Amino acid sequence: MMTNLFSVFDPSTTILNLSLNWLSTFLGLLLIPFSFWLLPNRFQVVWNNILLTLHKEFKTLLGPSGHNGSTLMFISLFSLIMFNNFLGLFPYIFTSTSHLTLTLALAFPLWLSFMLYGWINHTQHMFAHLVPQGTPPVLMPFMVCIETISNVIRPGTLAVRLTANMIAGHLLLTLLGNTGPMTTNYIILSLILTTQIALLVLESAVAIIQSYVFAVLSTLYSSEVN
């Protein structure tokens, strides 16, 4: 059991040992065309309300300096991460957001583009961010080092936070799932099943929260460079 504990995170398949499991990341693209020829249902109404709420919140975070349509990128980022987080909760579907390969590929280009835009177009504003307001002159060099380090590690913290939360929950679900078939006591089996259902509900909440945190922090990082 323990030797196969991390097998759920293996992107390789039995077909020529290729990493075809990454294709599950793009399953969400199959659902997009349905909105063009199906009548609006309750799910679409709820989803549109969620997107509208996110648009208003991200618009507030970006402030008056945000460009028109700038929230579309962060709403799309939220949708992509949340969809892949939920896909990983289904049996036999690969969780792409549990790999730093994907999370870093999302976080690093965003952070790098924000930094390049800020340092090229608002150089003085970016220098001012390195020294918090009210810092004593003696501590200014020290604060510049701290702010620089905290700025550089931002894409890493974004990626690791999402990956660690996905891995932790899936490991617990895998451990309970492997323990169940070896249990002959029906009372213990019912307790394991109840715990697994509760964990599944908790992981569903984590899937939403982590995608929201990723999108909100990305929005805040972009608002700092304007």
UniProtKB/Swiss-Prot annotation:
InterPro entries: ATP_synth_F0_asu, ATP_synth_F0_asu_AS, ATP_synth_F0_asu_bact/mt, F0_ATP_A_sf. It comes from Anopheles quadrimaculatus (Common malaria mosquito). Keywords: ATP synthesis, CF(0), Hydrogen ion transport, Ion transport, Membrane, Mitochondrion, Mitochondrion inner membrane, Transmembrane, Transmembrane helix, Transport. F-type ATPases have 2 components, CF(1) - the catalytic core - and CF(0) - the membrane proton channel. CF(1) has five subunits: alpha(3), beta(3), gamma(1), delta(1), epsilon(1). CF(0) has three main subunits: a, b and c. GO terms for molecular function: proton-transporting ATP synthase activity, rotational mechanism. Belongs to the ATPase A chain family. The keyword Lipid biosynthesis does not apply. Gene3D superfamilies: ATP synthase, F0 complex, subunit A. This is ATP synthase subunit a. It is found in: Mitochondrion inner membrane. SUPFAM superfamilies: F1F0 ATP synthase subunit A. The chain crosses the membrane at residues 20-40, 74-94, 100-120, 158-180, 197-217. It is a multi-pass membrane protein. Mitochondrial membrane ATP synthase (F(1)F(0) ATP synthase or Complex V) produces ATP from ADP in the presence of a proton gradient across the membrane which is generated by electron transport complexes of the respiratory chain. F-type ATPases consist of two structural domains, F(1) - containing the extramembraneous catalytic core and F(0) - containing the membrane proton channel, linked together by a central stalk and a peripheral stalk. During catalysis, ATP synthesis in the catalytic domain of F(1) is coupled via a rotary mechanism of the central stalk subunits to proton translocation. It comes from the Eukaryota. Pfam families: ATP-synt_A. One of its GO terms (cellular component) is mitochondrial inner membrane. NCBIfam families: ATP_synt_6_or_A.
